[in-house]
């Protein structure tokens, strides 16, 4: 058994040595061998040409179509946004115009109402002044008439009172003409 184990060790040693010699011997890693460079470059060129053809014929048109579709969508959205902006500006201008018209109309109605009320109140004031002036004139006439009536009654009452006073003081009744003359003189002095 010991021999077989030793042979195995010896065999492994020979196999390892031969593997190292093959790697060092001339069979190296193919990409680093100068003899295979032309075929590697040709394979690389063929691979890149194939990749270019596939990308340019298949992938790029799809990507380009997606980009074009997105650009058209963006342009459409921008156009729609501009249209909506223009519509909103037009609506805002129409609103401002209507608002200005409504304000002007309201101011005109207010001015017209103020003028009507001023004219109406002026007419009412004038009618009231005329009515009051007529009532005042009637009152003054009534007062003058009442005063004249009262004064004529006062003259008679004053004459009777003066005659009674003189009769009480002197015991004799004075002459009616004398008493009336004295009362008239007294009333003219106070009037």
From Swiss-Prot:
Keyword terms: ATP synthesis, Cell inner membrane, Cell membrane, CF(0), Hydrogen ion transport, Ion transport, Membrane, Transmembrane, Transmembrane helix, Transport
Region (Disordered): 1-31
InterPro entries assigned to the protein according to its UniProt record, in alphabetical order: ATP_synth_b/b'su_bac/chlpt, ATP_synthase_B_chain
Transmembrane segments: 38-60
Subcellular localization(s) per the UniProt record: Cell inner membrane
Protein task: F(1)F(0) ATP synthase produces ATP from ADP in the presence of a proton or sodium gradient. F-type ATPases consist of two structural domains, F(1) containing the extramembraneous catalytic core and F(0) containing the membrane proton channel, linked together by a central stalk and a peripheral stalk. During catalysis, ATP synthesis in the catalytic domain of F(1) is coupled via a rotary mechanism of the central stalk subunits to proton translocation. Component of the F(0) channel, it forms part of the peripheral stalk, linking F(1) to F(0). The b'-subunit is a diverged and duplicated form of b found in plants and photosynthetic bacteria.
Assembly and interaction partners: F-type ATPases have 2 components, F(1) - the catalytic core - and F(0) - the membrane proton channel. F(1) has five subunits: alpha(3), beta(3), gamma(1), delta(1), epsilon(1). F(0) has three main subunits: a(1), b(2) and c(10-14). The alpha and beta chains form an alternating ring which encloses part of the gamma chain. F(1) is attached to F(0) by a central stalk formed by the gamma and epsilon chains, while a peripheral stalk is formed by the delta and b chains.
Protein name as it appears in the record: ATP synthase subunit b 2
Source species taxonomy: Bacteria, Pseudomonadati, Pseudomonadota, Alphaproteobacteria, Hyphomicrobiales
